[in-house]
Design a protein with these regions (language model features):
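Metallocofactor- and cofactor-centric catalytic cores in central/energy metabolism, strongly enriched
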Residues: 1-69, 73-86, 99-106
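Conserved anion/nucleotide-ligand pocket segment
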Residues: 91-93, 97-149
Length: 149
């Protein structure tokens, strides 16, 4: 709200581009907006992730929300209900913006050009936290449940 006002924006879109969160399984608290709001008021961090709080706040402010990580976040009946109620779009499960994207694009090209690949080595030269986050068992579980690792 403050950003929108300070920058004289007519509209904003909230885009989540943080690292993969700790795995949060779909639970009763995600089945309806009332249950989600109750869990949020009770600060139930077992079922409410930080990204869910950001998504909820964005929707409440009529700002579309795009989930760029493989987190549960907006992929719940409660968020769908809130989005529909406010007529605010939500989308996304994973940008596939790093190594996965490169491999998804390059591998078919190599095959089409009949280029054999004996191995694949990649380095994260930018040093983001994804590998460190994936070393955490609960985060790795979240990523694996939402993608093709």
């Amino acid at each position: 709200r403050d950003f929108k006002a300070a920058n004289n924006c007519d509209r904003i879109v909230v885009l989540w581009a943080a690292s993969t969160e700790i795995y949060v399984p779909l639970s009763d608290e995600h089945q309806s907006l009332a249950a989600l709001e109750k869990a949020m008021k009770e600060n139930n961090t077992e079922v409410i992730s930080p990204s869910m709080c950001y998504a909820y706040a964005a929707i409440a402010e009529d700002a579309p929300f795009v989930m760029g990580a493989p987190n549960l976040c907006v992929d719940t009946p409660a968020m769908w209900e809130f989005s529909k109620q406010k007529n605010v779009p939500i989308s996304g499960k994973d940008f596939k913006s790093g190594q996965t994207l490169m491999k998804t694009v390059l591998a078919p090209m190599f095959k089409t050009r009949m280029l054999g690949v004996n191995g694949w080595f990649s380095t994260n030269v930018l040093g983001n936290r994804e590998v460190k986050c994936l070393m955490i068992r609960t985060t790795s579980r979240q990523k694996k449940s939402a993608s093709c690792l």
